[in-house]
């Protein structure tokens, strides 16, 4: 059976959907190429501005957050003690080794406790990574994840399911461009009165995340194992 890697990119969207705004170069060349060559579409998530863990919960379990209390985070409530059906459990039943991977603190949203209740054999968080590079506001860059995925794939003989959560695109986005930071992409024709610096900073972060996706696809294509990347 093929390896399966599910990649959840932090605060990621296609900026070409923002009308009238122009960019000095293509922001997401790798994602656009992949979208044209393979199945692609849009996903609606249950949160905005915060709540990554609730997106994770819906994606992994298929359970709607509307079934919970207003503002509830299952990671902080029921999953502290309960086991929940998930894609990881389904794949374990098919013989997969199951892994969660996140380049941020393992205790954030109690992931270090919760992932075992969602069927994962291992959870690798930033505490177990080395040679980490950080962006100007202190979040780990996603480029480190390619090597971490490689380590997981090398750690088992059989098929692996790796649920990967990135963090580079996380806010808060600065209202002034950080000192000594020279963004590769410039934003033009932006909305009057809006926070152009914050948007330009964000655009450059997702551009780097797109580069990471390209590097990951290249690595997986050169590896002598079938792999599905979602």
Place the predicted regions along the sequence by residue.
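Solvent-exposed soluble domains appended to multi-pass membrane proteins
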Residues: 6-9, 13-230
